[in-house]
């Protein structure tokens, strides 16, 4: 039996489709928020490469090349690549903080160079945040912020205002991104 358009049977069918759509949307949101959750690992820092990059070994022996999430430190000189002011200081400070230590790694996934993007914790200290607060790194603006965004921005603002670390350079300061572009150095 055919019912006229707008009849109760048609309305129930529309309501069922609406409900299914809403449920599917909620499931997608939940799945995407879980995908953004970090995977937590414990690792020993083997070597600090830069003020925002290190090599660590997990409990099961996996070697990780870790890029600190949300920050960008001045480039340290490497064999054939020049460094920028405060590059060595940033690397040395990070080595002083975590070199040879066991750290917690909140891993958010790989970057385009297959490094693990992560927030590093030494006990209760967010090392990414500390590097920014001490003036050895700035907030990374090359990708959407994924973790501790407001805290990183506040720490950078205070470090700039207080002219600590690399911010003592004032108008002579060149961001790591601008330095890499000028020197045509690969990496973020």
Please state what every model-predicted region is.
Residues 2-188:
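Small beta-barrel nucleic-acid-binding modules, primarily SNase/OB-fold domains
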């Amino acid at each position: 039996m055919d019912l006229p358009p707008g009849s109760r049977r048609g309305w129930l069918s529309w309501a069922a489709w609406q409900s299914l759509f809403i449920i599917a949307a909620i499931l997608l949101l939940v799945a995407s928020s879980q995908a953004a959750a970090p995977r937590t690992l414990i690792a020993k820092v083997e070597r600090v490469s830069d003020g925002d990059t290190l090599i660590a070994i997990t409990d099961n022996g996996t070697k990780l090349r870790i890029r600190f999430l949300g920050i960008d430190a001045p480039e340290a000189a490497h064999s054939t690549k020049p460094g920028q002011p405060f590059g060595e200081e940033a690397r040395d400070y990070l080595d002083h903080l975590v070199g040879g230590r066991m750290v917690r790694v909140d891993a958010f996934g790989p970057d385009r160079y297959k490094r693990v993007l992560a927030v590093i914790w030494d006990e209760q200290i967010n090392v990414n945040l500390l590097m920014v607060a001490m003036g050895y790194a700035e907030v990374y603006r090359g990708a959407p912020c994924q973790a501790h965004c407001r805290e990183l921005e506040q720490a950078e603002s205070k470090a700039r205002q207080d002219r600590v670390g690399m911010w003592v350079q004032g108008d002579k300061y060149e961001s790591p991104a601008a330095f890499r572009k000028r020197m045509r150095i690969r990496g973020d």
